[in-house]
Amino acid sequence: MSEIIYGIHAVKALLERDPQRFLEVFILKGRDDRRLQPVIAELEAQGIVIQVASRQWLDKQAEDAVHQGIVAKVKEGRKYQENDLPAMLDNLEMPFLLILDGVTDPHNLGACLRNADGAGVHAVIVPRDRSAQLNATVKKVACGAAETIPVISVTNLARTMRLLQERNIWIVGTAGEADHTLYQSKLTGPLALVMGAEGEGMRRLTREHCDELISIPMAGSVSSLNVSVATGVCLFEAVRQRGG
């Protein structure tokens, strides 16, 4: 099986991490972009086939998204499932996890992955039936983070949360109405942060399985933040508390 990725950062990240996955790369005919040149040089050094293509063809492969003049056909990456989680946790002294409940917009998922990678999150957990798929759009927005951070798809999020609690991982969920704020919460131990869908928040069962609910204090007239922005705020407060 193969898949398409596009964008300079996404291609560069995979090239650095797993060049064996590349099947062929297509670049825009006549494109003279200094950012592309080192990527092309490394592709050639790895012996990866490079072909020139028209903008119309590249646009079609990227489904009219912004591809920055480069599209790659690659072997499908590893898909993480819930049965991968126990072994992963066994190897973590201080787990730092992100749970996304109902983030179905690919741009939001990609931005959340980028935040998670920057914050040093060990894995992102998503419900199989209520999450955007790890498609080319997600990988483009994630700027390489989709290739470096495990995204674990689970069939039963509540069951997975119970597993985490059995491992003494403290689960903190975000809810706008929560009295306890992010900055009053202790985020220094084994931690799973739960972010809900924008506008809807966490589902009832997800909320009930949280050990603690927190809110982000808002000073202006808006009542909430974009889910990827809120995720970044919460993750990096945890990083600050954890001495990062």
From Swiss-Prot:
Subcellular location: Cytoplasm
Keyword rRNA processing on entry: yes
EC number: 2.1.1.185
Positions of S-adenosyl-L-methionine binding: G196, I216, L225
Main location: cytoplasm
GO cellular component: cytosol
Keyword Methyltransferase: yes
Reaction equation(s) it catalyzes: guanosine(2251) in 23S rRNA + S-adenosyl-L-methionine = 2'-O-methylguanosine(2251) in 23S rRNA + S-adenosyl-L-homocysteine + H(+)
Pfam families: SpoU_methylase, SpoU_sub_bind
GO MF annotations in UniProt: RNA binding; rRNA (guanosine-2'-O-)-methyltransferase activity
SUPFAM superfamilies, alphabetized: alpha/beta knot, L30e-like
Keywords (A to Z) from UniProt: Cytoplasm, Methyltransferase, rRNA processing, S-adenosyl-L-methionine, Transferase
UniProt function note: Specifically methylates the ribose of guanosine 2251 in 23S rRNA.
HAMAP family documented for this protein: 23SrRNA_methyltr_B (MF_01887)
Subunit details: Homodimer.
Family: Belongs to the class IV-like SAM-binding methyltransferase superfamily. RNA methyltransferase TrmH family. RlmB subfamily.
Name by which UniProt lists this protein: 23S rRNA (guanosine-2'-O-)-methyltransferase RlmB
Taxonomic source organism: Pectobacterium atrosepticum (strain SCRI 1043 / ATCC BAA-672)
